[in-house]
Swiss-Prot record:
Active site: H422 (tele-phosphohistidine intermediate), C752 (proton donor)
Organism whose genome encodes this protein: Neisseria meningitidis serogroup B (strain ATCC BAA-335 / MC58)
GO molecular function ontology, one term from the record: metal ion binding
Name of the protein in its database record: Phosphoenolpyruvate synthase
Chain segments annotated as coiled-coil in the UniProt record: none
Gene: ppsA
Length: 794
């Protein structure tokens, strides 16, 4: 067969992009180069750019197209739609030239013969010669047709693929990116179908799509064919896998988030383009579990690493699990085109919203920006034209056809979709904040309503009422002076960890476990340990919350492990000091099922908390769960940069008892390099510092409690709040005692209280006293670093 017009995938390399487009060249590259390394890619063939150009030259088609486009204004959406439709119909009506027709038939017959004469089904996909250039994400600009069989249906699908180079979004996109229409050609790829209609499929990236953090693989997954994930028609499951521990052969799944997965795309019994697939509802039982196993997540992540290493750059990869043979296949791989382009930009832009906020709805945050404007509710594509510059576009889900109007919006909000859908990809590329998968945003938001859309607060994006006060700060990270002390960060929210990873720091000086328990678990540990004793209503609520996990107790341990592992991975191999849960009894009582198990205390700030709680008969089994989670993170997952901090240790007896309890739960001081840090936050800790240090490897000073207990004031009381000041001479005496005791014994001493974040002069005094590290809120890291360098590097 002449390979003028048709080439088999295995004969293609990345050097053939101009002949068969990025998508098909990449399939050929993987089949020929990565099959031996264990990456499975279904085979097939591609038509060439020459074939496409020969087709357009046939019957004077290209002249008619050029004439129609020459006078088109793409900002006129109605005219764009009319001209695009006319051109596409011309293409569908034009038969293939004789040679192309013959080569397609010969290739198809060979494909059928190679399959043993079976009635095979294929995917017919477009691959534009400019589609996957790193500076132009043509994501989903052209069509894909799934479950096509029979030669006539394959040829019809190829006609549709060729026509898709002139759909509205593709025409608009080329103008937007400065491509001439006739320099982009199209290749049709014909690939054996993976039966993910009865399995699962999704997308993965070899970096975090929102922060650009490149030490993770981000995997999305849902039931059925992958188009729903790509189009944003479902909210998929999401997983993060940590590359360094994956390479080391350790369990490396950092985090799992269950998506709603309401529908799945399956095959129909029709085999022609446009009729070969349909969506059906997913049974509730399947929705309430993860669509792929931990073993499959890990296997996919290994494929992602292999592909990324081969291409030498971050990648965006589509995959499918065949429901018949149970195997995982890679369907596409292309360069990631947004975050990896920002590598040279070492400026950090942070958004903060000031004042009171009323949440109208929430979903998955795309990007890390904030947008504001009036709501523009759009039911379908026919209303697109009503979107004006600065509107907040609110709709059920966007179609890639909407790209021409998406760039007018100040923000985008959708009911459906996950972080790898088209709306998300285009929003990222345009630099517009988007909140996807809100569920019912189109019902909760009203046309013309003024809103603020925030993607600056972690994985969850919020739509707030009104045009709120937004503060923007820009920081250049390139020219940071040497810090005169170790600067660390206080981080509680694992969802923000990757965003903070590019801040200059020595690690996390305070990782608050209670944030994980409160936000990501929300249930009292005793209610989970005694699940069988709960009433039916509480059982139902707990069962709903723990969907996807093996048991109530497993849920608690797994969620703590996920949160801590994410925090530790974000700064690995730098230290992460994890404080064991420091809830007070009233805070524990607020958790689901908690009011039954907690005492009522007049002053919980000074009550049943810290070390005394951990060793108490009515809580030590709960503490054991926290220990089990941290042991897993350190010993199984290999994140040995995790250190343990014990808060609120009142007496030397408590210190001895809690160290013993940790050892009994597998967390022995010194074993596998484990350091135990004590929070030095009571006057007794400072006065008896040398004795307390017998049990610990150092102190982290909690200046908040140390101040209130030294000065005898309730920090939660507004009546005496004016007297609260960490810089009070009495407090400084206590801190001096603690720091000097650590220095004398050559043990670690840091501070993780609020004081240094609020008062740079206090941070300076601490450094002069000999403190080893100051742990700051992330938003004050740069400012305090620069202040200390300026004051102390003289």
């Amino acid at each position: 067969m002449a390979d003028n017009y048709v080439i088999w995938f295995e004969n293609l390399r990345m050097t053939d992009v101009e002949r068969v487009g990025g998508k098909n060249a990449s399939l050929g590259e993987m089949i020929s180069q990565l099959t031996e390394k264990g990456v499975r890619v279904p085979g097939g063939f591609a038509t060439t750019a020459e074939a496409y150009r020969a087709f357009l030259a046939h019957n004077g088609l290209s002249e008619r197209i050029s004439a129609a486009l020459a006078k088109l204004d793409v900002e006129d959406v109605a005219e764009l739609a009319r001209v695009g439709k006319e051109i596409r119909q011309w293409i569908l009506d034009t038969p293939f030239p004789e040679q192309l027709d013959a080569e397609i038939e010969a290739a198809w017959n060979k494909m059928v013969a190679d399959a043993g004469g079976a009635d095979i089904s294929v995917a017919v996909r477009s691959s534009a010669t400019a589609e996957d250039l790193p500076d132009a994400s043509f994501a989903g600009q052209q069509e894909t047709f799934l479950n096509i069989n029979g030669l006539d249906n394959v040829k019809e699908a190829m006609h549709h693929v060729f026509a898709s180079l002139y759909n509205d979004r593709a025409i608009s996109y080329r103008v937007h990116k400065g491509f001439e229409h006739d320099i982009v050609a199209l290749s049709a790829g014909v690939q054996r179908m993976v039966r993910s209609d009865s399995g699962a499929s999704g997308v993965m990236f070899t970096l975090d799509t929102e922060s650009g953090y490149d030490q993770v693989v981000f995997v999305t997954s849902s039931y059925g064919l992958g188009e729903n994930v790509v189009q944003g028609a479902v909210n998929p499951d999401e997983f993060y896998v940590f590359k360094p521990t994956l390479k080391a052969g350790k369990p490396a799944i950092l985090r799992k988030t269950m998506g709603s997965k309401h529908i799945k795309m399956i095959f129909t019994d029709k085999a022609e383009a446009g009729k070969s697939v349909t969506n059906v509802d997913v049974p509730e039982e399947d929705r309430n579990r993860f669509s792929i196993t931990d073993e499959e997540i890990t296997e996919l992540a290994h494929y992602a690493l292999t592909i990324e290493k081969h291409y030498g750059r971050p990648m965006d990869i589509e995959w499918g699990r065949d429901g018949l043979d149970g195997k995982l296949y890679i369907l596409q791989a292309r360069p990631e085109t947004v975050k990896s382009q920002e590598e040279g930009n070492r400026n950090l832009r942070r958004f903060a919203i000031n004042g009171d906020k009323t949440v109208l709805c929430e979903g998955r945050a795309i990007g890390q920006k904030v947008g504001q404007g009036k709501v523009r509710l759009i039911k379908d594509a026919s209303e697109m034209d009503s979107v004006e510059a600065g509107d907040v576009l609110v709709t059920d889900m966007t179609d890639p056809d909407w790209e021409p109007v998406m760039k007018r919006a100040s923000a985008i909000v959708t009911n459906r979709g996950g972080r790898t859908c088209h709306a998300a990809i285009i929003a990222r590329e345009l630099g517009i904040p988007a909140v996807v998968g809100c569920g019912n945003a189109t019902e909760l938001l009203k046309n013309g309503q003024e809103v603020t859309v925030s993607c600056a607060e972690g994985d969850t994006g919020f739509i707030y009422a009104g045009l709120l006060d937004v503060q923007i700060t820009d920081v250049a990270l390139d020219n940071m002076p040497k810090a005169p002390v170790k600067v660390m960060m206080n981080v509680g929210n694992p969802e923000l960890a990757f965003s903070f990873a590019n801040l200059p720091s020595e690690g996390i000086g305070l990782a608050r476990m209670e944030f994980i328990i409160n936000r990501q678990i929300g249930i009292h540990p005793k209610a989970l340990l005694e699940f069988d004793k709960q009433d039916d209503e509480l059982k139902a609520e707990i069962t709903r919350r723990i969907a996807g996990y093996a048991s109530p107790v497993d849920f608690y341990v797994d969620k703590i492990a996920e949160g801590v592992a994410t925090l530790a991975a974000s700064v690995y191999p730098r230290k992460t000091i994890v404080r064991m849960s420091d809830f007070k009894s009233n805070e524990y009582a607020n958790l689901v099922g908690g009011n039954v198990y907690e005492p009522h205390e007049e002053n919980p700030m000074l009550g049943f908390r810290g070390a005394a709680r951990y060793v108490a008969d009515n809580f030590k089994d709960c503490f054991a769960l926290e220990c089990k989670a941290l042991k897993r993170v350190r010993d199984e997952m290999g994140l040995t940069n995790v250190e343990i901090m014990i808060p609120f240790v009142r007496t030397l007896g408590e210190a001895e008892a809690v160290v013993k309890a940790l050892k009994e739960n597998g967390l022995e001081r010194g074993k596998n390099g484990l350091r135990l840090i004590m929070m030095c936050e009571l006057p007794s800790n400072a006065v008896l510092a040398e004795q307390f240090l017998q049990y610990f490897d150092g102190f982290s000073i909690g200046s908040n409690d140390m101040t209130q207990l030294t000065l005898g004031l309730d920090r939660d009381s507004g009546l005496v709040s004016e007297s609260f000041d960490e810089r009070n001479p009495a407090v400084k005496v206590m801190l001096h005692l603690a720091i000097s005791a650590c220095r004398k014994q050559n043990k670690y001493v840091g501070i993780c209280g609020q004081g240094p974040s609020d008062h740079p002069d206090f941070a300076k005094w601490l450094v002069e006293e000999g403190i080893e590290s100051v742990s700051l809120n992330p938003d004050t890291v740069i400012e305090t670093w620069l202040y200390l360098a300026n004051e102390l590097n003289k």
